[in-house]
UniProtKB/Swiss-Prot annotation:
The lineage of its organism: Bacteria, Bacillati, Actinomycetota, Actinomycetes, Micrococcales. The gene is araA. CDD domains: L-arabinose_isomerase. It comes from Clavibacter michiganensis subsp. michiganensis (strain NCPPB 382). Catalyzes the conversion of L-arabinose to L-ribulose. Its EC number is 5.3.1.4. Keywords: Arabinose catabolism, Carbohydrate metabolism, Isomerase, Manganese, Metal-binding. This is L-arabinose isomerase. Its cofactor is Mn(2+).
Length: 505
């Protein structure tokens, strides 16, 4: 049994330096020393989230090919960074780049920041040739169709490190999805279209394994929870949450809280034993469960599990990826759903929530643990955490199956404080203003056919999802402050043509 983690500590990125034997041993030694220094600066930078491992300078085709194969075989290696310190004839890179299956970043940099104007000679020029060595390298990558991110500048520059760090987080999300197993308890909500999808194609495209288990397999785990285990979990609830009086020990609804704890214990046991990193439930398929899982889902998401409601495994995958990509950053990631609008002119905003399952990592406050009726599902009143999402920048992201490909849509948003308290709304919630405005955002979202379930991340911005989609060779449409509906509609049409042509080629 393995506990879920979002840590990036077990991941590493290899730092590669290109050159050639033409330069001689003395120059190649300088290349090695200076490239080690660049790698060291990255490794020691606080905004670089993954370990950087320097590799010996690559000077010929055989060593480059072997490096690519070794990287492919290394589970902990989530990507490669390459820099051509000198001129490295790009035909040497063909076999290696063609074989490479890991995310790739081309760092266009050099050892020095400023030119030593008064002392520059031809030895300096021959040693520091990235300005044209990387152009040769860029050509062969483009000719081979290598998917990569290109970052330009010195690693001492904050924006350069930030861009590299963002790509590393995307590569970590890609690695996490590739090792992800999703357990679906029951099927999709009946007659719902957008939560459907091609699970076989998803395994081919993203590496994720999605399979279904009968809900009563989970019920057996819930029923096996012991009184001692439940007591310990209820003790934990009392330290973390403001519990409604009727749910406390001795209260008339305390047994409902204990059953909610049993659901959490059963779910965690099932997921850990099966090595799952994400799961789905459906209120239409609850088997012998007495409550729709609410509190348990919220707490498991907070630990790092992906989750999708109503059988929505695509959103569960996105949430798991977002949890890993945001590792160590303030904020959180959660299932979210656009519910209703505030349409007062000049004040337009969206109220988002779900029946129960919003992750408490979206708040720094102390949630309230409550019990209320639920009008669907036909079961006992479920327990859940209630809170307001912290104000601040965020992004909401959805995935749809468009028949011939998957499409990811991301909207940059600003979570805002509630205009007034919501004393009669018994669920966790978020209120946000979408960029560029509600009318344009909603029209673009509908034009894209984006899903009504999303992951809301307050940890990472849209650039992480841009890098993730690029690594995955998956369509991404972004709605932000620069979006116009006319331009967005054209982009949707262009993308349709491009992705269909790309598949054919």
């Amino acid at each position: 049994m393995s506990r879920i983690t979002t840590s990036l500590d077990h991941y590493e990125v290899w730092f590669l330096t290109g050159s050639q034997n033409l330069y001689g041993e003395e120059t190649l030694q300088q290349v090695a020393e200076q490239s080690q220094e660049i790698a060291r600066q990255l490794e020691e930078a606080s905004d670089i989230p993954v370990r950087v491992v320097w590799k010996p300078v690559l000077k010929d085709s055989d060593s480059i090919r072997r490096m690519a194969l070794e990287a492919n075989a290394s589970d902990g290696t989530i990507g490669l960074i390459a820099w051509m310190h000198t001129f490295s004839p790009a035909k040497m890179w063909i076999q290696g780049l063609d074989a490479l299956q890991k995310p790739f970043l081309h760092l266009h940099t050099q050892a020095n920041v400023a030119l030593p104007w008064s002392s520059i000679d031809m030895d300096f020029m021959n040693l520091n040739q990235a300005a044209h060595g990387d152009r040769e390298f860029g050509y062969i990558q483009s000719r081979l169709g290598v998917v990569r991110k290109t970052v330009v500048g010195h690693v001492s520059t904050e924006s350069v490190r930030a861009s590299i760090g963002t790509w590393m987080r995307a590569a970590a999300g890609w690695a996490a999805v590739h090792e992800l197993k999703v357990a679906r308890f029951g099927d999709n909500m009946r007659n719902v279209a957008v939560t459907e999808g091609d699970k076989t194609e998803a395994e081919l495209k993203f590496g994720v394994s999605v399979n279904t288990w009968g809900v009563n397999d989970l019920v057996a785990r819930v029923d096996a929870a012991t009184d001692a285990e439940i007591d310990a979990l209820v003790d934990e609830y009392e330290t973390l949450y403001d519990i409604q009086p009727e749910l406390r020990r001795g209260g008339e609804r305390h047994e409902s809280l204990r059953y909610g704890a049993a659901i959490e214990l059963g779910l965690r046991s099932f997921l850990e034993e099966g090595g799952f990193g994400a799961f789905t439930t459906s209120f239409e398929d609850l088997g012998g469960l007495r409550q729709l899982p609410g509190l348990a889902v919220q707490r498991l998401m907070a630990e790092g599990y992906g989750f999708g409601a109503e059988g929505d495994w695509k959103t569960a995958v996105l949430i798991r990826a977002a949890k890993v990509m945001g590792s160590g950053l303030p904020g959180g990631a959660s299932l979210m759903e656009d519910y209703t609008y505030h349409l007062v002119p000049g004040e337009e905003k969206i109220l988002g929530a779900h029946m129960l399952e919003i992750c408490p990592t979206l708040t720094t406050g102390r949630p309230s643990l409550e019990i209320h009726p639920l009008g669907i599902g036909g079961r006992e009143d479920p327990v859940r955490l209630v809170f307001d999402t912290d104000p601040g920048p965020a992004v909401v992201v959805a995935m749809s199956d468009m028949r011939d490909r998957f499409r990811i849509v991301a909207n940059v948003v600003e979570v805002v404080p509630l205009d007034e308290p919501l004393p009669n709304l018994p669920v966790a919630r978020a209120v946000w203003k979408p960029a560029p405005d509600l009318a344009t955002s909603a029209a673009a979202w509908l034009t894209a056919g984006a899903a009504h379930h999303t992951v809301m991340s307050t940890q990472v911005g849209v650039e992480v999802f841009e890098d993730f989609a690029e690594i995955a060779r998956t369509e991404l449409l972004v709605i932000d402050e620069d979006t116009t509906l006319k331009g967005f509609t054209k982009e949707v049409r262009w993308n349709q043509a491009y992705h269909r042509l790309a598949q054919g080629l």
